[in-house]
């Protein structure tokens, strides 16, 4: 086995958590069952990596085999990437329904990249919900592909959506987009203002897969009794007012966010560009031609659930601004706010 391939494999093994080692190697389906059983998973990672390298040398493992293992590791740890969402479209009057041929898609995608760029490594794997995972390691006309900084693509056949991890070589982005459009038989490709490390949440948002069934508020008696925690010895009027206010906040929150778990996003960003306006005449900003610019960014490990909890916690009034509640429905978490 080539020295560079062995080093690539060593680095992959070192970054796989021991608790996932057996699962990932089994899913890789390169080593035999007997070889997998012979691996001592209780030894130090460095020795474990050498043992796997020797087993792969016996089977004459190639760079493509290692690239596939790296792709599988990324599928298990997809949250380590920042994913951008793109929406493709067909030509006006084009056929909206095309039969998808997996082999043709892979062949066309790979051929376009290799025609334009001699040194490129492309790997494919069909994963959950028939999604096509693609790993592209980019080189140049004069250098071999950098296997340690690949781009990952997740495409759902017969849909317009594709998810792409950040590319370290910006010059390769147009070529990647061209290969995707041609292979999937689309004409245009536009980036949405939506990105996150939680790929599953992004797919739930663009495909509207999160539960949108709102609760029925015709009867709130059981909710009042079980969740308010009011003391029975308080004045009955105060209890009634507190109960009604909590019910109102609860209803407004559920109407805005629904009664289902929210997709997990880490941030939302708002860029404000607006002219200065004042009822008071004059002022140093009154004649300013350039718009005022402001950037506001909200961040949280689970931003939408955090926003959903603001009003019930008494931190914000209801209803919340539509700019905060429309993120899933608008399919965006990057906003530009102008005068219009």
Swiss-Prot record:
Keywords: Centromere, Chromosome, Kinetochore, Nucleus, Phosphoprotein. It holds the Pfam family CENP-N. It is found in: Nucleus; Chromosome, Centromere; Chromosome, Centromere, Kinetochore. The modification Phosphoserine is found at residues 227, 236. GO terms for biological process: CENP-A containing chromatin assembly; chromosome segregation. The keyword Nucleus applies. One of its GO terms (cellular component) is inner kinetochore. Coiled coil: none annotated. Component of the CENPA-NAC (nucleosome-associated) complex, a complex that plays a central role in assembly of kinetochore proteins, mitotic progression and chromosome segregation. The CENPA-NAC complex recruits the CENPA-CAD (nucleosome distal) complex and may be involved in incorporation of newly synthesized CENPA into centromeres. CENPN is the first protein to bind specifically to CENPA nucleosomes and the direct binding of CENPA nucleosomes by CENPN is required for centromere assembly. Required for chromosome congression and efficiently align the chromosomes on a metaphase plate. Component of the CENPA-NAC complex, at least composed of CENPA, CENPC, CENPH, CENPM, CENPN, CENPT and CENPU. The CENPA-NAC complex interacts with the CENPA-CAD complex, composed of CENPI, CENPK, CENPL, CENPO, CENPP, CENPQ, CENPR and CENPS. Interacts directly with CENPA. Identified in a centromere complex containing histones H2A, H2B and H4, and at least CENPA, CENPB, CENPC, CENPT, CENPN, HJURP, SUPT16H, SSRP1 and RSF1. Belongs to the CENP-N/CHL4 family. This is Centromere protein N. It comes from Rattus norvegicus.
């Amino acid at each position: 086995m080539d020295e560079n391939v062995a080093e690539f494999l060593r680095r992959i093994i070192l970054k796989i958590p021991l608790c996932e080692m057996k699962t990932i190697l089994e899913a890789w389906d390169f080593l035999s069952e007997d070889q997998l059983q012979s691996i001592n998973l209780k030894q130090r990672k460095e020795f474990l990596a050498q043992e796997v390298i020797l087993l792969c040398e016996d089977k004459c493992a190639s760079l493509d085999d290692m690239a596939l293992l790296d792709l599988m590791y990324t599928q298990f740890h997809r949250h380590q990437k920042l994913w951008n969402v793109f929406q493709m479209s067909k030509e006006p009057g084009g056929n909206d329904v095309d039969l998808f041929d997996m082999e043709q898609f892979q062949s066309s995608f790979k051929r376009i990249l290799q025609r334009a760029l001699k040194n490129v490594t492309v790997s494919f794997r069909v994963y959950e919900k028939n999604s096509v995972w693609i790993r592209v390691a980019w080189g140049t006309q004069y250098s071999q592909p950098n296997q340690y900084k690949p781009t990952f693509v997740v495409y759902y056949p017969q849909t317009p959506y594709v998810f792409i991890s950040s590319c370290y070589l910006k010059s390769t982005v147009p070529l990647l987009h061209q290969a995707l459009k041609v292979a999937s038989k689309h004409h245009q490709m536009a980036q949405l203002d939506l990105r996150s490390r939680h790929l599953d949440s992004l797919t739930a948002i663009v495909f509207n897969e999160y539960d949108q069934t709102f609760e029925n508020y015709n009867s709130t008696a059981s909710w009042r009794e079980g969740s308010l925690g009011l003391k029975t010895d308080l004045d009955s009027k105060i209890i009634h007012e507190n109960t009604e206010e909590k019910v109102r906040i609860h209803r407004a929150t559920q109407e805005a966010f629904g009664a289902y778990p929210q997709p997990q996003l880490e941030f939302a960003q708002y860029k404000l560009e607006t002219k200065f306006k004042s009822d008071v005449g004059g002022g140093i900003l009154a004649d300013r031609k350039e718009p005022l610019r402001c950037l506001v960014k909200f961040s949280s490990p689970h931003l939408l659930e955090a926003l959903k909890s603001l009003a019930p916690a008494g931190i914000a009034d209801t209803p919340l601004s539509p700019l905060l509640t429309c993120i899933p429905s608008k399919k965006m978490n990057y906003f530009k706010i102008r005068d219009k």
